[in-house]
Amino acid sequence: MATEHVNGNGTEEPMDTTSAVIHSENFQTLLDAGLPQKVAEKLDEIYVAGLVAHSDLDERAIEALKEFNEDGALAVLQQFKDSDLSHVQNKSAFLCGVMKTYRQREKQGTKVADSSKGPDEAKIKALLERTGYTLDVTTGQRKYGGPPPDSVYSGQQPSVGTEIFVGKIPRDLFEDELVPLFEKAGPIWDLRLMMDPLTGLNRGYAFVTFCTKEAAQEAVKLYNNHEIRSGKHIGVCISVANNRLFVGSIPKSKTKEQILEEFSKVTEGLTDVILYHQPDDKKKNRGFCFLEYEDHKTAAQARRRLMSGKVKVWGNVGTVEWADPIEDPDPEVMAKVKVLFVRNLANTVTEEILEKAFSQFGKLERVKKLKDYAFIHFDERDGAVKAMEEMNGKDLEGENIEIVFAKPPDQKRKERKAQRQAAKNQMYDDYYYYGPPHMPPPTRGRGRGGRGGYGYPPDYYGYEDYYDYYGYDYHNYRGGYEDPYYGYEDFQVGARGRGGRGARGAAPSRGRGAAPPRGRAGYSQRGGPGSARGVRGARGGAQQQRGRGVRGARGGRGGNVGGKRKADGYNQPDSKRRQTNNQNWGSQPIAQQPLQGGDHSGNYGYKSENQEFYQDTFGQQWK
């Protein structure tokens, strides 16, 4: 054993034999596992110090440690030893996180984070002793509570609407400052502070779940734009945890029961399927559906599995995205709504029929029918309430209609969405790929317009300003889910037929009756008119012309994508939200979907490679 103490300074080596290295009973096990002598000694030193037991580390951690060279493994173990492990529940996972962080720093050429930049452990300990909460630390987040002590709250886990998002948090701020602030709003279920393992500081945002919805709403009122430090204001809003997935490329002949059965075979936690039928054929769906899971975690796992390319449903790898989350409007606002959202209307139903059916309950301000749904504006709320009570579920022209109160728009949300759309338009300077908001299609000319859009009448776009067209939603009613995807099954088909002149820079035609450029023509790129006369471009984006002409050569890529894709050969495309013309909903951020950019104090996005299922995101910005 004498050789184990030689360190190059033999003349200064103490002669006291009591300083001999003491190994634990697991030292030989580490050597047998294949760890180098010095690495095994370093890890065993941690065992002897009582920081970690051998049983705390699983085989995965030992195998990962073996992949490092000796210097790297020793550096990892030293950092692991120096870390405060008192609040780490899964020490094996924590060690793996340290190894991952070390490799990332090694690639970037950065130094190990200064441990002095972390939280004040004395203050954290005092906080935990005062509140009785627990603290679980991983390399990606610090979780305070969840569940809280019985003395604070002994009920069931809080439901949707009890979680808030906190942004613009100073990077060196921790639980000792956040908890005392937010517990004033009400009892906290848990607080999750997202951490950057490369710096040892937080990412600039956190999530706080309260035990009641009232406490969450109170926290937003109290602390949105609150000055938490001199010159530092945090932003607070209600967070919506998403547990729904959008799935495309669904065979149109499949029923809700068949879809539920099939996807339950390949994913876990599926609770419901939201399916919409074609207005003119109730036996066929629209080629997409929404899958609802137990919680966000199971939805994230299902999304990861379905996007792996290894899982096929009906022999096809479908399109999978996060669905837009449902946001519950303020109850006080909903109590003033006088507009009804009516869906499942038969094709024969007109605005005149609707006006006649609903006017018996009170004076109407306006009736607006769009496809197979409509909005009924009452002069007084009492009339709307009576109409919903009497007409909901009743037969109208052969179809049982469904009625709910329409959701008013969130003006701040629309402003944020417009800002994001403007940013996208600057990034992608392609008029037909990202059409401007609220631009009505050209309506001159005769004949059948292109099937590439939604087919809404021109005045519909002014109607959007009055109410968010995608904001109408009541669980599985269309508003929040169906409208944006109304033309999903045929959104890629280019313009056809004779029509009127397309103005320079005008949006491409939408649906029946909206005229495409005059003559047999497609669209030109970047919104400008084509130079040739009478030439029709083929699939992939064509030139815009006047007059009739002969069929031209195959057009280049760009513009609106032409032609349907067959379901069996449907490759994973870019997000459908990023391909649809003139729809502002396309750039709306989705809860729990990674956003681009790494400045979490500004836009709260982070790169996908850093995402874990618990790392929610929110794209709200505060001014």
UniProtKB/Swiss-Prot annotation:
Sequence repeats: 448-450, 451-453, 460-464, 469-472, 478-480, 485-488, 498-500, 526-528, 539-541, 554-556, 557-559
PROSITE patterns named among the record's database cross-references: RRM
Known tissue expression: Ubiquitously expressed. Detected in heart, brain, pancreas, placenta, spleen, lung, liver, skeletal muscle, kidney, thymus, prostate, uterus, small intestine, colon, peripheral blood and testis.
Span list, region 3 X 4 AA repeats of Y-Y-G-Y: 460-488
Chain positions with N-acetylalanine modification: 2
Residues modified as Phosphoserine: 159, 587
SMART domains per the UniProt record, alphabetical: RRM
TM regions (residue ranges): none
GO cellular component: catalytic step 2 spliceosome; CRD-mediated mRNA stability complex; cytosol; endoplasmic reticulum; GAIT complex; histone pre-mRNA 3'end processing complex; mCRD-mediated mRNA stability complex; membrane
Subcellular location: Cytoplasm; Microsome; Endoplasmic reticulum; Nucleus
Keywords annotated in UniProt: Acetylation, Cytoplasm, Endoplasmic reticulum, Host-virus interaction, Isopeptide bond, Methylation, Microsome, mRNA processing, mRNA splicing, Nucleus, Phosphoprotein, Repeat, Ribonucleoprotein, RNA-binding, Spliceosome, Translation regulation, Ubl conjugation
Record PTM: Phosphorylated on tyrosine. The membrane-bound form found in microsomes is phosphorylated in vitro by insulin receptor tyrosine kinase (INSR). Phosphorylation is inhibited upon binding to RNA, whereas the cytoplasmic form is poorly phosphorylated.
CDD domains assigned to the protein according to its UniProt record, in alphabetical order: NURR_hnRNPQ, RRM1_hnRNPQ, RRM2_hnRNPQ, RRM3_hnRNPQ
Annotated NCBIfam families: hnRNP-R-Q
Protein name: Heterogeneous nuclear ribonucleoprotein Q
Organism: Homo sapiens
Gene name linked to the record: SYNCRIP
